[in-house]
Structures are given as structure tokens and as C-alpha cells.
UniProtKB/Swiss-Prot annotation:
Organism whose genome encodes this protein: Mus musculus (Mouse)
GO molecular function, one term: cysteine-type endopeptidase inhibitor activity
Function, as annotated: This is an intracellular thiol proteinase inhibitor.
Primary site of residence: cytoplasm
Name of encoding gene: Stfa3
Record site feature (Reactive site), residues: G10
Protein's name in the database: Stefin-3
Keyword NADP tagged: no
Organism classification: Eukaryota, Metazoa, Chordata, Craniata, Vertebrata
GO annotations of cellular component type: cytoplasm
Length: 103
């Protein structure tokens, strides 16, 4: 097994631009996030993400919520796919340049 493979398993991927699929996942958990933060976001645009392979997949998504404000959220996607999504955490008061990290 190469060092490259050892480094990737369980670790976070490099940051990648958000895709339509990542936006769809963010939109699906948005109501839970808004309930937990007691906020209604007019803008909710996924801009980048990192992934982590576990027994499923953790997605760390940076969201532009407008006015120069960003938030980071952690979404678990189970092995059964798009219908098995769980909001596992979030961080508010982030900036565009804040790096996505494990939470």
C-alpha cells in the first residue's frame, strides 16, 4: 500500500469547488441548520467542500450566507445515499478564507 493511500483513508480530502450535488445535499439539510441556528438564510450557496470516508462519508461544506458571512457544516451521508443525510455539526461566523477543518 502506498503512502498516498495511507494518507487519504480517514483523512480529509483537499478542498474542491462545490458541485450541484453538494448544493443539493446542503439544501436538504438547510431546514435543520436553520432550526438549530435560529436563523433564516436568504442566501445559501455551497462554495467548496472536503470529504472524509468513514462508514459512509462526512462532507464538510463551506456555505456563503451573504453579506460576506460564511458558515461551515458537517453532513454525514450514509451508505444508502442521498436520503440518508444527517447534519452532524456546524460553525458560524466564518470568513471566505477560513479553511474547512474536521469538527
Amino acid at each position: 500500500m502506498s503512502q498516498e493511500n495511507l494518507k487519504i483513508k480517514g483523512g480529509l480530502s483537499e478542498a474542491r469547488p462545490a458541485t450541484p450535488e453538494i448544493q443539493m445535499i446542503a439544501d436538504k439539510v438547510r431546514p435543520l441548520l436553520e432550526e438549530q441556528t435560529n436563523e433564516k438564510y436568504e442566501k445559501f450557496e455551497a462554495v467548496e467542500y472536503k470529504s472524509q470516508v468513514v462508514a459512509g462519508q462526512n462532507l464538510f461544506i463551506k456555505i456563503d450566507v451573504g453579506n460576506g458571512c460564511f458558515l461551515h457544516m458537517k453532513v454525514f451521508r450514509g451508505l444508502s445515499g442521498e436520503d440518508d443525510l444527517k447534519l452532524k455539526g456546524y460553525q458560524t461566523n466564518k470568513t471566505k478564507t477560513d479553511e474547512l477543518t474536521s469538527m
